[in-house]
Structures are given as structure tokens and as C-alpha cells.
Amino acid sequence: MAWSQSARKPMIGLLFRAQQHSARGYSYSAFQAHLSSSNVDQSATLLRRFSSEVPASEQMNLIKQLRERTSAPIKDVKASLVSCNWDIDVAQKDLRKRGVVLAAKKSSRTAAEGLLAIAQDEKRAAVVELNCETDFVARNDVFQYLASSLAKLALSARDPGELVFPFGPDYLENLNVNLDHPKLSGETTVQSAVTEVAAMVGENVKFRRGFIMSTTAHGVVCSYMHTCPQPGLGRLAGLITLEAEDSNAPLDALQRVGKSIAMHIVATKPLFLSKELVSASAVENERDILRTQAESSGKSQMAMEKMVEGRLRKYFEEVVLLEQKYVVNDSTNIKSVLNDLSKEVGSKVTVGNFARMEVGEGVSKA
């Protein structure tokens, strides 16, 4: 065999040098240490010689193929191929093992970038947030595919039986997901899929949260995604359910107006649906702030009270959806838009629920 023949000459040389060292008074232990060191050097030389037997053009081709299969960094791809004697299948398994270890090491790093993904049918919509460390990874097709897959899984999971159902990672992480992407395929758990993608992209990747919104039999779920790299993905999401009292009301009109209001929600960030739903403590806190501001004006008590009430109305216009000026036409408000829609469909239309979500909100980036 070529290996044993190529190793024979260096061994003869080693024995010859050992005899010389012995004649010069070297100890047995010193000779052993020298021999062990020389053997390691010779083995490394043989491995390099074996690796170099793969032509440079074929090495580049193997690196390209493994890079396409895994999306791993080129330096890691080459290192695995070299350590696995350029066997691409063995190297792919080696890369996966390395990636899982590296992903675990990076799991404590802040992941405040990423994407929202939405999946919906006529009566329900599911939104999930998948985080990473940089917007560069958020543009990665494997990352985007995983985000979309998680949204579809959330929508197909058991019906929670609630009109609005927020959930954390534990709701999905142990469920199986079927993946069909050139670089990410097969059936695995959500937790394993997230770890595998983290290994591919070289960043901390986390499934953070999500929610499911449902409507009644005579309603629609409407959504809007902002800054979309592709349909169903974005950095901001607005959702709203509109419900008609009459079951014969045309739902396409509700969808048309509802989508526009969902866009409005993304732009204006409402906190409450109606004035009645603003907590008494929130109103009183705002009133105290406005009263303190009015006192510095030096006006009479009656004038200051009028100032406070006027500014309180302005506060409601800022945080209450029904009182907000419509971004599409600021000469009217959302309440008037719904009144006009009710006349159009011949049935009273009301808002069931609404939600707004943004990537990374509430995550400390320090």
C-alpha cells in the first residue's frame, strides 16, 4: 500500500538518527520523546500529502457544492472537507455537528433583528417572530423559509379556542415541522430546526413569540405587512378583525376596508380600541401631566381646565383607534370609516380585535 511504503523511509531515517543520539549519550526517555514528536510530524505530512492528491479544481468544486448544501461559512466548509479527506457527505455531517456546538455557544447573544411571518385563512391568522442578530441574516432565504414555515405550523396547530391567543416559544418548539427546502428538509422539531438554521447562518437565531387572531362566522381577518422582502414576511404587522351583524353582508367589502385599517394600525400605533377601554388610571395619569403643564401658563383655573380637556381629547386621538385620524384621509377618523362601511354593506360593522407587532420591540440591544 502506498501509505506503508511512503512511511518506511522516514522510519529508517529516524532509527539511524536515534543510534547517533544514543552514541552521544542521549537518555532513553529523550530518545522516546524525539521519536514521538517525529512520528507526529510525519503523520501530519502524510495527511497533507493525501489531501493534496485531490486536484485544486476538484477541491474548489467540492467547497462550492458543500457551501450550497449547507450555507455554512467558506472557511468552515473547507476545514470540514480537509479534516474529512474531501469526502463531501462525511464533511456535511461534520459541519452539522460543529454548527450545533457553535449555535449553543452563541445562544446568549442578543438577537433583536429578524422577521415577522404571517399565515392566514378566511377566519384566522397566525403571526410569528423569528429573531437573528443582523438584518443581513434576515435576508437569508433559509431564515425566511423557516419563518414562513413556523407561521404555517402555528396556523395549522390545534385551535386555541380564543379570539386572540398570544404564545411564546414553548407553544411550538416541541412540535414537528415538515421542511422542504434545498438546504433544510425533512421532519424535525421546531427547536431543532431553529438550531440548525443558527448553525447555517452563524448567528444566534431565536423563535421569540407569536399570536393567533380569529373572527366570528360573519367576520374577516385583515392584515398588512410592512417592509416585505417577500409576501407574508415583514418587520411590522398590523391585524384587525371586522364583524358584520348581518350574515348576508358582503365580506369582500370588509376585507377591502379592513386591509386599509390594518395599514393604518402599523402607521399610528394605537393602544386602545375605544375611549371606554382606556383604563381610569391611564386617563388620570395623563390628566395630571396635562394639568401640571397648564399650571405653568399662568391662566385662570377655568381656562386651565379647558386646556386640560382639549389636550385630553388630543391624547385620545393619538392612542384610541376609533378616534384616530385616518391615515388615508385625515379629514375623517376610523369611527367614521366604519360608519360609512356599515352603510355600504347594509349592516353594522364593528371591530372585534386588533394588534400591532414589530420586530425586536422590547428587546434590549445593549
Curated annotation (Swiss-Prot):
Gene Ontology CC terms, in alphabetical order: mitochondrion
Keyword list, A-Z: Elongation factor, Mitochondrion, Protein biosynthesis, Transit peptide
Predominant location: mitochondrion
Gene3D superfamilies linked: 1.10.286.20, DNA helicase RuvA subunit, C-terminal domain, Elongation factor Ts, dimerisation domain
GO molecular function, one term: translation elongation factor activity
Pfam families in alphabetical order: EF_TS (PF00889)
The organelle targeting sequence, given as a residue range: 1-50
Superkingdom field: Eukaryota
Location relative to the cell: Mitochondrion
InterPro entries membership: EF-Ts_dimer_sf, Transl_elong_EFTs/EF1B, Transl_elong_EFTs/EF1B_dimer, Transl_elong_Ts_CS, UBA-like_sf
A GO biological-process term: mitochondrial translational elongation
Keyword check for Lyase: no
Biological role stated in the UniProt entry: Associates with the EF-Tu.GDP complex and induces the exchange of GDP to GTP. It remains bound to the aminoacyl-tRNA.EF-Tu.GTP complex up to the GTP hydrolysis stage on the ribosome.
Record-stated family: Belongs to the EF-Ts family.
Name of the protein: Elongation factor Ts, mitochondrial
